Amino acid sequence: MAMTLPITAVTAAICALLLLITAIDTVRQRMQSRTAFGDGNGNARLISASRSHGNLAEHAPLAIIMIALLEPSADPRALSAVAAVFVFARICHIFGLYAPMSTEPPLGRKIGVVGTWLTYVVLIAWTLYAVARLGS
């Protein structure tokens, strides 16, 4: 049996795994700090854990949806590359949120933000272009 959207499936599975890992760490940090809600009065580890989870949950769905919409007609190598950059950016962002903070954001966080935004721009433009081509 052939899978209809393999690039989307792999991207979604990796993002789901990252969400599970960050959710488990958030619960672990909550248990260690005995914090049911909130950030534990500024507990840096809890904030990092909950934001790494929340930020991924905020960004992954739309990227996955656009990848799924593009996949049936897209060049699989190009779409795989964009999906890989997105996943790499999200992993960098997670590591960046766990890095010790100084006066500026850690490199991983910067790479994660820029990589996520760039893949969003590419996916948005590609999706709109694909829709525009339907009308011609």
Residue positions per predicted region:
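Interfacial loop-to-transmembrane junctions
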Residues: I94-V121
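Transmembrane alpha-helical segments that form the membrane-embedded catalytic/substrate-channel core
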Residues: I14-Q32, V87-L97
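Cytosolic, membrane-interface loops and tails of multi-pass inner-membrane proteins
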Residues: I24-S50
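Short alpha-helical packing/oligomerization segments
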Residues: I67-A89
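Juxtamembrane boundary at the C-terminal end of a transmembrane helix
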Residues: I124-S136
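Alpha-helical transmembrane segments
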Residues: L5-I21, R77-V82
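Physicochemical signature of membrane-embedded alpha-helices that form the seven-helix bundle of GPCRs
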Residues: T11, S50-H53, V82-V85, G108, ...
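Core segments of transmembrane alpha-helices
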Residues: G54-I67, Y120-V121
